[in-house]
Amino acid sequence: MENIIQVRVRYKETDQAGRVYHANYFVWLDMGRTEFLRVLGFPYNEMENKGFYLAVTEASCNYIKSPNFDDIVNIKTILGKVGKASIDFTYEITSRDNNVFYATAYTKLACLDENGKPIKLPEEVLSKLVLDG
């Protein structure tokens, strides 16, 4: 299961050389993951209103080439392993036409209660991810 969003590289996301500053890739990963879950019917605000939170516990990014200011990039979010209390995602950041790979990335999210303690993913989320994924 995957979802793709497009992002235009904003000036504030670049360094003095006009290249994307490395930390901004993680902002894009968050945008892609948030939209992935929204499309599945699980917007973050609704999950939080139900008392569970998804917190990033691992994140890595392999930088291949930097897009430039005003480029449009695709952020592909791909569902990985779904555990009882965690979800893995991988990502591909490419040019609009998919001809240039800018980065690949990975995140692991843990399901937490309102006190920050690990809990099992709610059954409605787990079944949707496992059945549709």
Where are these regions (language model features)?
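Catalytic strand-loop segment that frames the active site of acyl-thioester-processing enzymes
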Residues: 1-36
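HotDog/MaoC-like acyl-thioester-processing domains
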Residues: 3-5, 38, 68-69, 80-133
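Hydrophobic residues in beta-strands and at strand termini
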Residues: 7-11, 63, 111
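Residue-level signal for pocket-adjacent positions within structured domains
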Residues: 9, 15, 37, 42, ...
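Residues that recognize and position ribonucleotide moieties
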Residues: 19, 52-54, 100, 119
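Residue-level recognition of specific faces of alpha-helices
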Residues: 25-28, 53-55, 90, 108
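Hydrophobic beta-strand-centered segment that forms part of the acyl-chain substrate-binding groove
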Residues: 36-87, 103-104
